[in-house]
Regions:
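Juxtamembrane transmembrane-helix boundary motif
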Residues: 2-3, 11, 17-43, 64, ...
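Interfacial segments of multi-pass membrane proteins
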Residues: 58-72, 198-214
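Hydrophobic transmembrane alpha-helices of secondary-active solute transporters
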Residues: 43, 47, 184-189, 204, ...
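Generic transmembrane alpha-helix signature in multi-pass membrane proteins
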Residues: 58-60, 86-98, 185-189, 199-201, ...
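Juxtamembrane transmembrane-helix termini in multi-pass membrane transport proteins
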Residues: 50-103
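Transmembrane helix-bundle signature of multi-pass membrane transporters/permeases
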Residues: 74-82, 107-111, 216-224, 252-253, ...
């Protein structure tokens, strides 16, 4: 029964912890939160466009903005991802932008490794400390990877490469590709994050000529069984908030469909900057950057990226204009 004096007094005297939840985010209710639906739609669109950022953006959003308990936020995000990622993967499979052989080799390593990671987390004496340290290392790796992607973009533009969205034939390297799956699976099993962003960085380093559309499609597809394996652990041992999960599904599934349709048909030159931006944001969150600071940093990154784009584009455009004035028509030899 509701007693106004006791409730009001408790609310005044109790110390603030997280933001006051919007609605009932307990594990048993099915309340749909429209704000979570909207937020998950934004994240779902980014996941569909890039294949990355799901765990790094969705979970902090639930905890910091909506006051969901961390354990419930992680578990609910994983379960919702089981429906979200197959939608994006299906779009890319239909478009033919998935390297099925790469997916097979990666899954061969990632799914067993995900269970191994969950077991290691269970037996470690300082599990929370180990998880935090892993996330910090993962964040640093993602930031280095984002910087490498920017450098590669600059070099490609200077050299006149990477101006088409053609899908190149990628010959799988079985052992290194399985190793990528193992590394990603263990980290996902221990931290519940990194199934998309980490795999993208590792794939880029192993297969530097892979196209952006094929990169996103392959990453989304390999993440499906990996996310399912992690979600099984969440269902068995986690604390799922069913209302939060339903809200995430309602927002993210349609949005990831739209994002995947765009990423499977848009030119590479538009997709790669978005991938880099999302991976950089994920890396900053993993290393512990606060939400407000992250916002200002990302604004600065966008400004720097725009200035860099202007600096790189102008010489290339000028050279292209000069070439247009050159007569390349073959002439008969003069005897």
């Amino acid at each position: 029964m509701y007693h106004a004096p006791e409730t009001d007094g408790g609310r005044r005297d109790g110390p603030p912890h997280r933001p006051e939840p919007r609605g009932d985010h307990t594990t048993t209710t099915m309340h749909v939160d429209p704000y979570i639906v909207l937020g998950s739609a934004v994240v779902g669109f980014l996941v569909g466009m890039t294949g990355a950022g799901g765990g790094a953006l969705m979970t902090p959003m639930l905890i910091l903005l909506f006051g969901v308990k961390p354990s419930a936020a992680i578990s609910s995000d994983l379960v919702a991802a089981v429906l979200m990622r197959p939608v994006g993967a299906g779009v890319h499979l239909k478009k033919g932008t998935v390297n099925r052989r790469l997916v097979g080799w990666m899954v061969l390593g990632s799914v067993p490794a995900a269970f191994l990671g969950a077991y290691l987390l269970h037996v470690l004496g300082h599990a929370k400390s180990a998880q935090t340290n892993i996330e910090r290392v993962l964040g640093a790796a993602l930031l280095l990877g984002a910087a490498a992607m920017v450098l590669r973009y600059i070099l490609d533009r200077r050299g006149g490469n990477g101006r088409t969205g053609a899908i190149h034939e990628i010959l799988p390297k079985p052992i290194p590709t399985i190793a990528i799956g193992v590394v990603g699976g263990v980290i996902v099993g221990m931290t519940s994050v990194g199934s998309g962003s980490l795999m993208i960085i590792l794939l880029l380093f192993l297969y530097p000529t892979i196209g952006a559309k094929q990169l996103v499609g392959t990453d989304l597809t390999q993440a499906v069984p990996l996310t399912m394996a992690a979600a099984l652990g969440a269902l068995a041992f986690g604390h799922i908030a069913f209302g939060v999960t339903l809200s995430l599904i309602l927002g993210s599934v349609p949005a990831v469909l739209v994002g995947s349709m765009l990423s499977s048909s848009a030119p590479d030159r538009y997709i790669r900057p978005v991938i880099t931006f999302v991976i950089a944001a994920s890396g900053l969150k993993y290393v512990g950057v606060g939400t407000t600071a992250l916002g200002w940093i990302l604004v600065a990154v966008l400004l720097a990226a725009f200035i860099t784009w202007l600096a790189v584009k102008r010489p290339w455009a000028r050279a292209e204009t000069d070439l247009e004035g050159i007569d390349v028509t073959p002439h008969p030899e003069v005897e």
